[in-house]
Amino acid sequence: MSVAGLKKQFHKASQLFSEKISGAEGTKLDEEFLDMEKKIDITSKAVAEILSKATEYLQPNPAYRAKLGMLNTMSKLRGQVKATGYPQTEGLLGDCMLKYGRELGEDSAFGNSLVEVGEALKLMAEVKDSLDINVKQTFIDPLQLLQDKDLKEIGHHLRKLEGRRLDYDYKKKRVGKIPEEEIRQAVEKFEESKELAERSMFNFLENDVEQVSQLAVFVEAALDYHRQSTEILQELQNKLELRIALASQVPRRDYMPKPVNTSSTNANGVEPSSSSKLTGTDIPSDQPCCRGLYDFEPENEGELGFKEGDIITLTNQIDENWYEGMLRGESGFFPINYVEVIVPLPR
């Protein structure tokens, strides 16, 4: 910094100290300017908090948000274009219902109903994905641009104005000790900064209908999401009511006890249970899992390490390259090409 620059910084600091500690009064700006400045300050705070809350509205689980951020960063580093999507709660519940509905089979009324509800929830998850994309593009991104460009520029003008105001007030109180030319230049710079800040705030506040338009687009997207979800649920409700009506017309069967087959009992007259036949390496047939083909050492936070031959419980497929699973009470991500799937995840 030049000598002149250091001198100016000293003037500002000295004037600020005088105002804060000694109670000296600085140059007052007009009420209209102060009113605009207050509205800009409130708008800046509103935009910052709305951006945060809008993201929570679309993706309420902070752990999943952090996980997605890490995975998408890793994908970018690997040169992968496709980003990992947020796992919608409707989709997760739908997967669960589909899995057990199919296991119960088509001869089970409850199983068939689980499949129908699961498929409907999967459709709702797709609609929610569309809402996420729509709101991000038409509401969150424009607000982010507003914060990063317009409000940032206004903030720059206001900070510059305050600096020049302090410099001007310092020199104004030292008339006779400071050359008149310096005071005149300080006045000109102060007035120039005030005009720039005033014009930028005025133009922003006069065009705030743009933000109203963005809110309208957000509401329209939310309305469309709820409209489509209502249609899906209404159709599902009709199916379930029809299934209940048909089930009430089917005659109930009487329970008929079956004779016990004693041919396979052991010496004590007790048939071995299925659980007693399992060894420590047996895998439940209904539990999605995989076996490690190679040792995998985690390099990043959130990754799950394992050894060759380890049996890992599968909980989710993140993308075409990564699984999420559990091993010995720990959960994390690991590459698909390091394992052999034994029981696949439900589709």
UniProtKB/Swiss-Prot annotation:
Region described as Required for dimerization upon membrane association: spans on this chain = 60-87
Q: Which domain of life is it from?
A: Eukaryota
PROSITE patterns on file: BAR, SH3
Gene3D superfamilies recorded for this chain?
Arfaptin homology (AH) domain/BAR domain (1.20.1270.60), SH3 Domains (2.30.30.40)
**Known InterPro entries for this protein?**
AH/BAR_dom_sf (IPR027267), BAR_dom (IPR004148), Endophilin-A3_BAR (IPR032469), Endophilin_A_SH3 (IPR035824), Endophilin_SH3RF (IPR050384), SH3-like_dom_sf (IPR036028), SH3_domain (IPR001452)
Tissue-level expression reads: Expressed at high level in testis and at lower level in brain and liver.
Q: Name one GO molecular function term.
A: lipid binding
Keywords, ordered alphabetically: Coiled coil, Cytoplasm, Endocytosis, Endosome, Lipid-binding, Membrane, SH3 domain
For the region Interaction with ARC, give the residue spans.
218-254
Q: Where in the cell is it found?
A: Cytoplasm; Early endosome membrane
Give me the Gene Ontology terms describing cellular component. Answer: acrosomal vesicle; cytoplasm; cytosol; early endosome; early endosome membrane; glutamatergic synapse; postsynaptic density, intracellular component; postsynaptic endosome
Membrane topology of this protein:
Peripheral membrane protein
Any one Pfam family match given in the protein's UniProt record, by short name: SH3_1
User: Where does the SH3 domain lie?
Assistant: 285-344
Q: Where is the BAR domain?
A: 18-249
Residues covered by region (Disordered): 255-284
Using the UniProt record, give the first listed, main subcellular location.
cytoplasm
The UniProt annotation puts the region (Membrane-binding amphipathic helix) at 1-21
Q: Which GO terms describe its biological process?
A: endocytosis; negative regulation of clathrin-dependent endocytosis; positive regulation of neuron differentiation; regulation of clathrin-dependent endocytosis
The UniProt regions of compositional bias labelled Polar residues, in chain numbering, are 260-284
What else the UniProt entry mentions is: Cells overexpressing Sh3gl3 show inhibition of transferrin uptake. Olfactory epithelium-derived cells overexpressing SH3GL3, DRD2 and GRK2 show accelerated differentiation upon addition of apomorphine due to reduced agonist-induced endocytosis of DRD2.
Please describe the quaternary structure of this protein.
Interacts with SGIP1 and DYDC1. Interacts with FASLG. Interacts with ATXN2. Interacts with BIN2. Interacts with ARC, DNM1 and SYNJ1.
| Similarity annotation | Belongs to the endophilin family.
Question: Briefly, what is this protein's role?
Answer: Implicated in endocytosis. May recruit other proteins to membranes with high curvature.
Q: Know the name of this protein?
A: Endophilin-A3
Q: Which organism is it from?
A: Rattus norvegicus
